[in-house]
Curated annotation (Swiss-Prot), chain A:
Function noted in UniProt: With CysN forms the ATP sulfurylase (ATPS) that catalyzes the adenylation of sulfate producing adenosine 5'-phosphosulfate (APS) and diphosphate, the first enzymatic step in sulfur assimilation pathway. APS synthesis involves the formation of a high-energy phosphoric-sulfuric acid anhydride bond driven by GTP hydrolysis by CysN coupled to ATP hydrolysis by CysD.
Region of interest (Disordered), residue spans: 282-301
Gene Ontology BP terms: hydrogen sulfide biosynthetic process; sulfate assimilation
InterPro entries listed in its UniProt record: PAPS_reduct_dom, Rossmann-like_a/b/a_fold, SO4_adenylTrfase_ssu, Sulfate_adenylyltrnsfr_sub2
Reactions this protein catalyses: sulfate + ATP + H(+) = adenosine 5'-phosphosulfate + diphosphate
One GO MF term attached to the UniProt entry: sulfate adenylyltransferase (ATP) activity
Keywords assigned by UniProt, alphabetized: ATP-binding, Nucleotide-binding, Nucleotidyltransferase, Transferase
Subunit structure of this chain's protein: Heterodimer composed of CysD, the smaller subunit, and CysN.
NCBIfam families, A to Z: CysD (TIGR02039), PRK05253.1 (NF003587), PRK12563.1 (NF009214)
Protein family membership: Belongs to the PAPS reductase family. CysD subfamily.
UniProt-recorded name of the protein: Sulfate adenylyltransferase subunit 2
Amino acid sequence: MTANLTHLQRLEAESIHIMRGVAANFSKPVMLYSIGKDSSVLLHLAMKAFYPAKPPFPFLHVDTTWKFREMIEFRDRMAAELGFDLLVHINEEGVRDGINPFDHGSNVHTHIMKTVALRQALDKYGFDAAFGGARRDEEKSRAKERVFSFRTASHTWDPKNQRPEMWKIYNTRVAQGESIRVFPLSNWTELDIWQYILQEGIPIVPLYFAKKRPVVNRGGMTIMVDDDRMKLLPGETVEERMVRFRTLGCYPLTGAIDSCAATLEDIVSEMLTARTSERQGRLIDRDEAGSMEKKKREGYF
Amino acid sequence: MLSSNAAAAVADAETETADIRAYLSSQERKTLLRFLTCGSVDDGKSTLIGRLLYDTKLIFEDQLAALEQDSKKHGTNGGEIDFALLVDGLEAERQQGITIDVAYRFFATPKRKFIVADTPGHEQYTRNMATGASTADLAVVLVDARQGVLQQTRRHSIIASLLGIRYIVVAVNKIDLVDFDEQVFAKITADYDAFAKDLGFSSIVAIPMSARHGDNVTRISERTPWYAGPSLIEHLETVDVAGESVAQPFRFPVQYVNRPNLDFRGFAGTIASGSVAVGDEVVVAKSGRRTRVKRIVTYDGDLPSAFEGQAITVVLEDEVEVSRGEILVAPEARPDVADQFTANIVWFDEHPLLPGRMYILRTETDEVSATVSQLKHRVNINNFAHEAAKCLELNAVGVCNLSLQSPIAFDPFGKNRSTGSFILIDRVTNATVGAGMILHPLRRAANIHWQALDVTKESRATLKHQKPAVLWFTGLSGSGKSTVANLLEKKLHAAGRHTYILDGDNVRHGLNRDLGFTEEDRVENIRRVAEVARLMADAGLIVLVSFISPFRAERRMARDLMGEGEFIEVFVDTPFEECAKRDPKGLYARALKGELKNFTGIDSPYEAPENPDLHLHTVGRAPEDMADELETWLRERGYC
């Protein structure tokens, strides 16, 4: 009978099932909200899962203070429109020490402003489960991760010793201080995400659509000059180009692609002919071999 | 006015938009096949998946560049592209050249979408293979043409069969390394068929292939002219795994009660089987209450009916009590409701399954404490023989009777994978230690009723002017448990209290004379003593239990048997060296010489209590002094 459901309906039902299981089993869940397309889908699914109630957990944005300005505007608008409970956490020590991606490099910046900040927020509120939007098709170490992924009290992941995960029966038991990262979009692909956004009319940050934007070429990537904290290096010039973003993160670390795709249909058709993966635009994955697995073991999402 | 060029461009764009929509809707109607690759180490599972992804053009340029670089660094093909590195994503896997955990990969052909689970071949990681198999409908079992059917081939096939997989592909891989010899293929096929005939598979399709070179993976190879069957991908695209599925009765396990305000009370869940419509009569499985479906609520509007796989919220006509763990079912076809049943169990943990030890049993939505009351037999992986066993070791498969603290609603696993499955969780570590597939309920559960008695525990205790309690003394042999317990009982007795001491050595002379010192027997030893202590507390006594009781899980089980505040854990904490020095019975000397096996603290572990109610550090203290402390503690809390 399952054959009667379309592919997206099956994925949607699976994600909703996972979210309800978390709400029923954990005393203090939270949904990580990173403002990107996957987070937008996650948010939409959460609205569906608990309808007519609002999602019974808050949404947490870990703000590195280097996000695109349009992302922050979008975040605040969505929170106001949908009326969900938004928490924003910034690593104030990092801000005080002036940590930034230009002087400290992507590694140090991401570790302090994102991974450490996330651990601070989880400890501060005492969350025992945290939803993330990671998908298994994104990257090799993510392809190995469980839907319910156990973290020790110090937020570390032990990839060599994951709990077996049988059927749709999830082991949600944790001791004091331990927690579970939950990935309801595990079985979605990038194409599924876009198709679902198209089908459901889910709002997304305008940066995903092509537009003339001020960019510079740096280290083989096209970086958008989003504010005056970005100083030009000798020989660099700002040019206005038609670009868009396949993923969104800190603006100095996120590469734009040349594109004319101004509608969702354009984006999907561009994707269907794409010859590179979406994470190619992420500087942090390429820093060192196995870098994503290493970050995840340290508590990165 | 648009220029003609601009108008054409708009028209093009509109056509393109329409094309994309049409393309996407055709994608939507594709069926999905979930399968896994399994088999022994080095049979080429990861390589096969890498080959499938590569040949179906699902590898992006940046990934291919990374793969070429990785192949030079870690590859096992002498610099040639090593497809296994596409899926072996963990650093440890790449360094060791093995698969440790299951990887999920996604690909599609014009005919179908696929989710493939690449599972590890090492016996050590069988639990990760089972994880991948539990959500799959088909298994591709790889066999190295040079090796033939191995123990792991058999183990994985048995587990696939137990987990409900009915469709098998035997991929006879590395056929190039046996010169594409038809006889080798025929022999392996015959061996596999002979072995698997009792595993209940609906179809077994054998394909000769070379994952490394691509023969018969996505295209038929000219190098196996004697093979007339389909390529792997052709078979995967066309195999019908829905098969003979008959309409199943309605099952709706309730996951979450949604109650945003006083006017709305909905039961959220995913339909496990069958369908339901507004107005249908449904029964709450455990309580037996009947009611009707008033509304089927979704975010996209109410539905007139819903079917298997849909995540919905049901509103009922009547205010019946329904909580998480209940199942709403069709009145004419109800599930079993019982607290005892028989099940197949696959064991995942380094610590063996022990009959009598209490575990947490969890179904899709329910959770209850459970013990294995009887281990009926272990299955021999090589010949399916039923072997007598006292415990199930890591990766073993067996048939067990389970006894639960309260009933659950379920179907046999053969009828329904969702409502017939469960996992077992260790109560101390919270690890997932086993997976179970229910065979049938045990009727004897239904025939033993609790006899209600008029004289209660409270009335018995009141007559004695005391509060019943179980003081559980745990500690190493020779730590002083019996000495302190004996002194305390003398004091309580002198004060007119009704007491009894259950002493480890003494009980082993009678009630537990049939038990030895293996881990299984120690668990049963404690279970019996805990039950006796419970009866004595029920009689209103203050019970002093003096047992080494080395395992946390059993002390936890004893605590759970007693009423609130009745169980008092006393940790008699004497360091090992001190006990060995005192050695009142000469046991340490013998154990250290190797004359006594399974001696706690030497070759059998002692798990110290983490939060005992009373912690006695005995070194430098007189036993009298400690007995006084205990008596004061009891008096202050009103036990005596």
